[in-house]
């Protein structure tokens, strides 16, 4: 711990100071310090306290005096000095100083032994330090809670912003709510609105008089003041009058909207002007014109839908016609092919029949020659034998008819064996020869 010499200018009250104490021993009262008192009194008092503590509590360490390391000057001069060369001296050696009175010198290098402290003592010290810091720093004090603001909406009037709510007297409140019950309204604002509409002619009269006379004369002002109440300047009255006169000049269709603005106290001047669009402003159309425009638009849409439907139907017809024509062409081609094949078959058959008729025995020569070998000798003898002219001729015709029937039967078998195709038949016929 650094051994420094401090000077202080604080004054201590005449009362005894009680320092924090623990449970083992009570605190000892200390004499108050004053610049006029001598240092000897302080040292005597401190030594007496330490001796008593050593006698009573030999197991505890000595508690150092709070003024053992401070040097007090009577002239209240601020001076701090430190001499490192005096660290090796004894405890009772004093440090010479030429700037102060020699009687105020006292030991500096007293060895200080740390005394163990208990938790209760540390808690008390912390609480005292917090109290001192809060008392010295006003910023550390808790800030006051802000007052509760009025969250009700306000309205702008000629005399400034006002609250929308109003406090009625007992008589006026009874009359107002009685009128509200008779009219069947659910809100008091509707009742007040009804009263304003009933009193509108009189209000307009007052407003016109205010607008014609920009500044009131003494007579006019005295006549109108009791009706409107006290206002500070004539400009407020002029503004109030202009609000009613402008509303009266407007159309009767918008009376409800303007009346609502008057009740709320919202003037036209307070509204923000919207920037004009670059495109030209279209004229307001009436209901009939808008209905006609809607009908024309519907007609145009119906025409477009019909055109689309017609186009689709035409496409379908064209596709169907193309498909029908294509099918007919395919059918005609098939028919022509069938006719050609049938014609060729008939033509070939005719040719074959003609050839067979002309060269019937030549076509089936081998077959006939083979069949002749199987004919009985009797029939052959009958054909060749001619004892009588009539009998052999008959037999010859019979044998010839039998041969013809056999040839025809075999020809039909040959025809069916070759198949139905005439080309194959002609090919086989050519190969035979």
Swiss-Prot record:
<keyword id="KW-0539">Nucleus</keyword>
<feature type="region of interest" description="Disordered">
    <location>
        <begin position="247"/>
        <end position="281"/>
    </location>
</feature>
<protein>
    <recommendedName>
        <fullName>Transcription factor TCP18</fullName>
    </recommendedName>
</protein>
<feature type="domain" description="TCP">
    <location>
        <begin position="148"/>
        <end position="206"/>
    </location>
</feature>
<dbReference type="GO" id="GO:0000976">
    <property type="term" value="F:transcription cis-regulatory region binding"/>
</dbReference>
<keyword id="KW-0238">DNA-binding</keyword>
<dbReference type="GO" id="GO:0006355">
    <property type="term" value="P:regulation of DNA-templated transcription"/>
</dbReference>
<dbReference type="GO" id="GO:2000032">
    <property type="term" value="P:regulation of secondary shoot formation"/>
</dbReference>
<dbReference type="InterPro" id="IPR017887">
    <property type="entry name" value="TF_TCP_subgr"/>
</dbReference>
<keyword id="KW-0805">Transcription regulation</keyword>
<dbReference type="GO" id="GO:0003700">
    <property type="term" value="F:DNA-binding transcription factor activity"/>
</dbReference>
<keyword id="KW-0804">Transcription</keyword>
<dbReference type="InterPro" id="IPR005333">
    <property type="entry name" value="Transcription_factor_TCP"/>
</dbReference>
<dbReference type="InterPro" id="IPR017888">
    <property type="entry name" value="CYC/TB1_R_domain"/>
</dbReference>
<keyword id="KW-0217">Developmental protein</keyword>
<feature type="domain" description="R">
    <location>
        <begin position="287"/>
        <end position="304"/>
    </location>
</feature>
<comment type="function">
    <text>Transcription factor that prevents axillary bud outgrowth and delays early axillary bud development. Indirectly required for the auxin-induced control of apical dominance.</text>
</comment>
<dbReference type="GO" id="GO:0005634">
    <property type="term" value="C:nucleus"/>
</dbReference>
<dbReference type="Pfam" id="PF03634">
    <property type="entry name" value="TCP"/>
</dbReference>
<feature type="region of interest" description="Disordered">
    <location>
        <begin position="130"/>
        <end position="163"/>
    </location>
</feature>
<dbReference type="GO" id="GO:0010223">
    <property type="term" value="P:secondary shoot formation"/>
</dbReference>
């Amino acid at each position: 711990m650094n051994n420094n010499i401090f000077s202080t200018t604080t004054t201590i009250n005449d009362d005894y100071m009680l320092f924090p104490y623990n449970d083992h021993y009570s605190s000892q009262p200390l004499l108050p310090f004053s610049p006029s008192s001598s240092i000897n009194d302080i040292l005597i008092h401190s030594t007496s306290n330490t001796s008593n503590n050593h006698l009573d509590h030999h197991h505890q360490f000595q508690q150092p005096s709070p003024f053992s390391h401070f040097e007090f000057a009577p002239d209240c001069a601020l001076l701090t000095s430190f001499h490192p060369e005096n660290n090796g001296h004894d405890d009772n050696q004093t440090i010479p100083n030429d700037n102060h009175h020699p009687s105020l010198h006292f030991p500096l290098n007293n060895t200080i032994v740390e005394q163990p402290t208990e938790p209760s003592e540390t808690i008390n010290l912390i609480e005292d330090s917090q109290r001192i810091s809060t008392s010295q720093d006003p910023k550390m004090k808790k800030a006051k809670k802000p007052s509760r603001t009025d969250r009700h909406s306000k309205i702008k009037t000629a005399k400034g912003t006002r609250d929308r709510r109003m406090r009625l007297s007992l008589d006026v409140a009874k009359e107002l709510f009685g009128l509200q019950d008779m009219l069947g309204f659910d809100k008091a604002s509707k009742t007040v609105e009804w009263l304003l509409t009933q009193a509108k002619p009189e209000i307009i009269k007052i407003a016109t008089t205010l607008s014609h006379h920009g500044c009131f004369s003494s007579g006019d002002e005295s006549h109108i003041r009791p009706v409107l109440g006290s206002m500070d300047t004539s400009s407020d009255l002029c503004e109030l009058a202009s609000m009613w006169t402008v509303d009266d000049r407007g159309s009767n269709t918008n009376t409800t909207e303007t009346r609502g603005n008057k009740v709320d106290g919202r003037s036209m001047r307070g509204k923000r002007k919207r920037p004009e669009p670059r495109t030209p402003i279209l004229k307001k159309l009436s209901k009939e014109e808008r209905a006609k425009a809607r009908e024309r638009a519907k007609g145009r849409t119906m025409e477009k839908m019909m055109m689309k439907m017609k186009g689709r139907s035409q496409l379908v017809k064209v596709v169907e016609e193309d498909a029908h024509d294509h099918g007919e062409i395919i059918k005609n081609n098939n028919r022509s092919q069938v006719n050609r094949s049938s014609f060729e078959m008939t033509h070939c058959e005719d040719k074959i029949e003609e050839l067979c008729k002309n060269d019937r025995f030549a076509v089936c020569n081998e077959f006939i020659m083979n069949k002749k070998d199987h004919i009985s000798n009797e029939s052959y003898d009958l054909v060749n034998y001619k004892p009588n002219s009539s009998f052999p001729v008959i037999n010859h015709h019979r044998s010839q008819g039998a041969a013809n029937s056999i040839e025809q039967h075999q020809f039909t078998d040959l025809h069916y064996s070759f198949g139905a195709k005439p080309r194959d038949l002609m090919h086989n016929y050519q190969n035979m020869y």
